[in-house]
């Protein structure tokens, strides 16, 4: 099955399946907000979206990488590549798809002048944290964000 997965640059016709998968990854986002963020990403040269498709040409995963010129925690220099999101449908996991996404993303980031890739996840997301460590990331720091309304 692994060799039958194709990895393709995002095309406009991939938007509906991308949004459907992104809603599974980022379930806390409102759909219109997520749609807006994805549309901005698909229109920018600072992002690379890769879609994995099965032999039936059905989308089974995606990855989004970006080039960041703002501060990335722990990065040695700028620009820094960034793994914005990665998702593989449950029935297609453990086939090496996520690893291939990482390889393709690293290659693109190197081509854009990056020597490191950052990423983030929620402190409580043990599955994501384990995945990041498995594919070669290290934990840079743990942060809790605060907010206060002012009157």
List PLM regions with ranges:
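Conserved active-site alpha-helix within GNAT-family acetyltransferase domains
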Residues: 99, 111, 123-142
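Helix-loop element at the rim of GNAT/NAT acetyltransferase active sites that forms part
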Residues: 19-33, 71
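A short beta-loop-alpha structural element at the N-terminal edge
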Residues: 4-18
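Conserved acetyl-CoA-binding loop-helix of GNAT-fold acetyltransferases
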Residues: 88, 94-107, 130, 134
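Conserved beta-strand in the GNAT
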Residues: 51, 58-67, 82, 87
């Amino acid at each position: 099955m692994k060799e039958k997965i194709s990895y393709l640059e995002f095309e406009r016709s991939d938007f509906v399946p991308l949004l459907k998968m992104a809603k599974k990854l980022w379930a806390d986002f409102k759909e219109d907000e997520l749609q807006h963020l994805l549309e901005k990403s698909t229109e920018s040269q600072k992002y690379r979206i890769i879609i994995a498709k099965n032999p039936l040409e059905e989308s089974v995963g995606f990855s989004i990488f970006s080039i960041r010129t703002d501060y990335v925690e722990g990065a040695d220099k700028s620009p820094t590549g960034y793994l914005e999101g990665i998702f593989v449908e449950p029935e297609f996991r453990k086939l090496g798809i996520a690893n291939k996404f990482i390889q393709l993303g690293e290659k693109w980031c190197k081509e854009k002048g990056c020597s490191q890739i950052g990423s983030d996840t929620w402190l409580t997301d043990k599955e994501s944290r384990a995945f990041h460590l498995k594919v070669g990331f290290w934990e840079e720091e743990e942060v809790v964000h605060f907010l206060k309304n002012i009157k």
